[in-house]
């Protein structure tokens, strides 16, 4: 077997492999021999079927398997001899083996770019000093208070207000006919919580308990269900009750209910400590990002297109999820798939460049990720999503997602290694950051 390597670009290789006749015939003979041990044909003892009969009867299967086996052996041999590993799937072009003929085929794949690593030992990195924001702490305490509030029916005969809960029946109509799927009974609507369309909430706030009302409601143009986008329908509403939350006092009794704290002061102290730890991690993460971004500015290397496509797909999937949680869709943005991909391309390229740099830094630092560490990470993912660990591992392995997961874990370790070698300079929190937190 001979091969020739052609660099199509700094991150893509094409390899032409030439297989001599002797190796082609040997591969066919080996595959036929496997069939001879397992095939049962009338008139022949098992294992005694002549090779010519096997080749004639199972020609398609034999030649397909022989080709695949031979190509796989060569790919492992050729790729193993190179200084780099594929960063994409390996594309094969070459047809099928033919007996007594030389077999020539090509494989092509993308590789990680080659570049000189910058010196980052002792580089100065500014990191903001974490501070406790009393407004943020108070907001957490208010959320705890709200969660422990008693929900009671309002005795006063009046419409519901923002911050209260309306118990109601509703149904949508178009041209006097009910719209299937847009109706509910005894629905509890939290008013002022962006749970429903503004027009609908205003309609609800007009009715007192026991009263029915109706009015027009217009769905936004970017509504997630295109069937209703921009459409005006008639909503009929009957309010049954108005409920309000009776907030408990911020005292020791609340602290005990919230989590067994011995006092309110102890609960507040715990919330402050948790907030400070969160801010510390946030400040560290921002410093690490600034550090890597600074190093990336000194480097110029191309990104494999397959890697770029993968991150663009991921960013668009995240965008789709965010929009759907808001009752919208990608289509509602009024942009073509190409325009959407162009929008996320710069961010995807930055993520890819960061990943490439950190994986190379991991090699430089001798950082590795064990199979046990990958399994532990998969167990956490499975637990959070409520799925079976073994099923998830098989899915990650089958779809090659496990390699992406390992690289992300490797990148995280490399980030820590670079950070440990940096000269961290603690600076006061920026005023605009503090104001944004408020």
Swiss-Prot record:
GO terms for MF: peptidyl-prolyl cis-trans isomerase activity; protein folding chaperone; ribosome binding
Localisation per UniProt entry: Cytoplasm
Catalytic activity: [protein]-peptidylproline (omega=180) = [protein]-peptidylproline (omega=0)
Gene Ontology CC: one annotated term: cytoplasm
Stored InterPro entries: PPIase_dom_sf, Trig_fac, Trigger_fac_C, Trigger_fac_C_sf, Trigger_fac_ribosome-bd_bac, Trigger_fac_ribosome-bd_sf, Trigger_fact/SurA_dom_sf
Family: Belongs to the FKBP-type PPIase family. Tig subfamily.
Pfam families reported in the protein's UniProt record: Trigger_C, Trigger_N
NCBIfam families (UniProt xref): tig
Key words of the record: Cell cycle, Cell division, Chaperone, Cytoplasm, Isomerase, Rotamase
Isomerase in keyword set: yes
Documented EC number(s): 5.2.1.8
Protein name: Trigger factor
Domain called PPIase FKBP-type: residue spans: 163-248
Superkingdom classification of source: Bacteria
Domain note: Consists of 3 domains; the N-terminus binds the ribosome, the middle domain has PPIase activity, while the C-terminus has intrinsic chaperone activity on its own.
TM region(s), chain numbering: none
Record gene name: tig
HAMAP family: Trigger_factor_Tig (MF_00303)
Known role: Involved in protein export. Acts as a chaperone by maintaining the newly synthesized protein in an open conformation. Functions as a peptidyl-prolyl cis-trans isomerase.
BP GO terms, sorted: 'de novo' cotranslational protein folding; cell division; chaperone-mediated protein folding; protein transport; protein unfolding
């Amino acid at each position: 077997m001979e091969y020739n390597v052609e660099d199509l670009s700094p991150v893509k290789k094409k390899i032409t492999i030439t297989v001599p006749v002797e190796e082609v015939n040997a591969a066919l003979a080996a595959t036929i021999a496997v069939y001879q041990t397992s095939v049962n044909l009338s008139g022949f003892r098992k294992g005694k079927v002549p090779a010519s009969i096997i080749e004639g009867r199972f020609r398609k299967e034999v030649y397909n398997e022989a080709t695949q086996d031979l190509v796989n052996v060569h790919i492992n041999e050729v790729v193993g001899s190179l200084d780099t590993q594929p960063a994409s799937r390996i594309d094969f072009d070459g047809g099928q083996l033919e007996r007594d003929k030389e077999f020539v085929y090509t494989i092509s794949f993308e590789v990680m770019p080659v570049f000189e690593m910058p010196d980052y030992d002792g580089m100065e990195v500014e990191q903001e000093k974490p501070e406790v924001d009393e407004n943020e702490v108070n907001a957490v305490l208010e959320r705890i208070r709200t969660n422990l509030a008693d929900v009671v029916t309002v005795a006063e005969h009046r419409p519901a207000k923002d911050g209260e809960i309306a118990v109601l029946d509703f149904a949508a109509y178009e041209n006097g006919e009910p719209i299937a799927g847009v109706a509910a009974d005894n629905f509890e609507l939290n008013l002022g919580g962006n749970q429903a369309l503004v027009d609908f909430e205003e309609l609800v706030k007009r009715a007192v308990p026991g009263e029915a009302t109706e009015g027009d409601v217009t769905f936004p143009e970017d509504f997630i269900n295109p069937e209703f986008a921009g459409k005006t329908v008639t909503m009929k509403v009957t309010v049954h009750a108005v409920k309000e939350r009776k907030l408990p006092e911020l005292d020791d009794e609340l602290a005990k209910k919230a989590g067994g704290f011995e006092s309110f002061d102890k609960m507040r102290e715990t919330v402050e400590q948790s907030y400070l730890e969160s801010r510390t991690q946030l400040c560290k993460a921002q410093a690490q990002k600034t550090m890597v971004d600074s190093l990336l500015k000194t480097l110029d290397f191309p990104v494999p297109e397959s890697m770029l496509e993968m991150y663009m797909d991921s960013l668009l999937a995240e965008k789709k999820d965010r929009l759907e949680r808001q009752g919208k869709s990608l289509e509602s943005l009024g942009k073509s798939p190409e325009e959407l991909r162009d929008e996320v391309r710069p961010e995807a390229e930055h993520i890819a460049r960061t990943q490439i740099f950190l994986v190379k830094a991991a090699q430089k630092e001798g950082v590795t990720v064990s199979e046990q560490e990958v399994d532990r990470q998969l167990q956490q993912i499975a637990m959070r999503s409520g799925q079976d660990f073994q099923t998830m591992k098989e899915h990650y392995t089958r779809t090659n997602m496990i390699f992406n997961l390992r690289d992300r874990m490797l990148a995280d370790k490399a980030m820590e290694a670079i950070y440990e070698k940096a000269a961290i300079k603690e600076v006061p929190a920026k005023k605009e950051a503090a104001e944004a937190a408020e």
